[in-house]
């Protein structure tokens, strides 16, 4: 069985946005008991990450690290038509991930105790992002 589901996420600018609950809901609705959930973001300046969900400082530290690694307004970037955060957002998205594959076991995503799925917005302004969930597996 293969099921697809679209997930829309409105961001308020740069940062991480938890989407684990929405993915879990799609898995439950699919009826798949054993399989995989592939998550793909349809954008080049946002990404998907699997990160610790208990301590928000982990995500803040990640943002601080990426800000040092790929600063906004770097004069070496030529692609600046949409502002000083545009090209750095593309680089950050490439350095993180645009897709994740999660195992489904017993009708749920088999995540670790402290794992959560996050949409990581790399632009400084709000955006509407689309994530395609493709669920494949055996129904219960």
PLM feature spans:
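Active-site histidine-anchored catalytic micro-motif
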Residues: 1-140
């Amino acid at each position: 069985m293969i099921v697809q589901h679209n997930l829309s996420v409105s961001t308020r600018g740069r940062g991480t946005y938890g989407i684990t609950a929405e993915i879990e809901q799609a898995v439950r609705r699919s009826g798949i008991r054993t399989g995989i959930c592939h998550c793909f973001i349809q954008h080049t300046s946002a990404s998907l990450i699997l990160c610790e969900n208990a301590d928000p400082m982990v995500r803040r530290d990640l943002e601080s690290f990426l800000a040092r690694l790929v600063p906004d307004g770097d004069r070496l970037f030529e692609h600046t038509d949409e502002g000083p955060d545009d090209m750095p957002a593309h680089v950050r998205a490439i350095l993180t991930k645009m897709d994740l594959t999660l195992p489904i076991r017993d009708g749920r995503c088999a995540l670790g105790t402290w794992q959560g799925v996050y949409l990581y917005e790399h632009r400084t302004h709000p955006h509407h992002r689309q994530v395609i969930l493709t669920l494949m597996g055996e129904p219960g």
